[in-house]
Regions:
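Long, charge-rich, low-complexity alpha-helical segments
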Residues: 1-171, 226, 231-293
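Acyltransferase donor/substrate-recognition loop-hinge adjacent to the catalytic core
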Residues: 175-181
Length: 293
């Protein structure tokens, strides 16, 4: 936000304006290297600095102390930058909660859950559970956050060639292949009208009231090329996709559905499901033969 940026710039200007006495020249006649270095020295300094940055209250400022004199910059920037990362990952959730409310939760999360890797690619996974604990009576909120997270992380799935409808019709064995579902495919169970909420926020329409569904529904999330997608499935199609998701072939999945009494053998319905999976880029092409020495 502009106000925070102006505050941060003001702190930086104040620090830059502080007079710094030039160092007195020192004549170096010899250097003696210690035989052993303190292995905990750097780690202790880093831990001490991190504790101050993560503390809710800043320590008293000592003008001649270079660390405490500049600590407000890091104390503010740490929370602000990670809150921006979370607001980007959970874009629809941020808009649903309101930017100020979300920012407060994001800053608290940044203190409770500091990053442990150099990349922030998957930072914030635990925010879904944090919102679930803080808002137990708002299941649509955590389901919306979960959908935001799932859509963003579909890009972590491997890039594999996909089978289109024309190629499938020319192939005689694709329905008997195992592990044929695209690796980015993910199935979730939702209990609210989270799909309507997400779509309304995305198109900037009036957001409907959050309601519970008559029965839990299956939500399929995947990536087609460079675009993440999601859609709900009816009960039978969801059962089919679950079998495919664990590695069964289409043939074996259909056999399992028949044995479980979940499908009556309707060929027209099966053809429609498979055509949709092919059209949505959810069927991976045949694995290339392994290279031989």
């Amino acid at each position: 936000p502009l106000a925070e940026l102006l505050d941060e710039m003001a702190i930086a200007r104040r620090v830059a304006a502080e007079p710094v006495a030039p160092p007195e020249p020192v004549a170096i006649t010899s250097i003696t290297l210690a035989s052993t270095a303190d292995p905990t020295g750097l780690a202790a300094v880093q831990r001490h600095f991190a504790d101050r940055v993560l503390a809710n209250a800043l320590p008293p400022e000592i003008p001649e102390d270079l660390i405490t004199g500049r600590l407000p910059i890091y104390h503010h920037a740490y929370r602000a930058r990670l809150a921006e990362v979370l607001a980007d990952t959970y874009g629809k959730t941020c808009l649903y909660m309101g930017s100020d409310t979300f920012d407060a939760h994001a800053r608290a999360y940044a203190v409770d859950q500091p990053p442990h890797t150099r990349s922030l690619n998957r930072y914030g996974e635990g925010l879904v559970d944090a919102l679930r604990q803080q808002y137990p009576d708002n299941p649509e909120l955590h389901e919306l956050a979960q959908l935001d997270w799932d859509l963003r992380t579909r890009f972590d799935g491997a890039d594999v060639p996909v089978l289109d409808l024309d190629s499938a019709q020319a192939s005689g064995d694709w329905t008997t292949r195992t592990d044929m579902l695209h690796p980015s495919a993910l199935l979730r169970t939702v209990t609210t009208n989270v799909v309507s909420l997400w779509n309304a926020i995305h198109t900037d329409d009036e957001v409907p009231e959050a309601v519970l569904l008559p029965a839990p529904a299956a939500l399929l999330v995947w990536r087609k090329g460079f675009q993440p997608h999601f859609r709900t499935l009816d009960a039978t199609e969801a059962a089919l996709v679950r079998h495919l998701h664990i590695g069964l072939s289409v043939h074996d999945a259909c056999t399992a559905l028949l044995e479980q009494g979940l499908w009556a053998g309707d060929a027209a319905a099966l053809s429609q499901w498979l055509a949709q999976l092919l059209g949505e880029g959810l069927v991976r092409a045949k694995h290339p033969p392994a290279a031989t020495a």
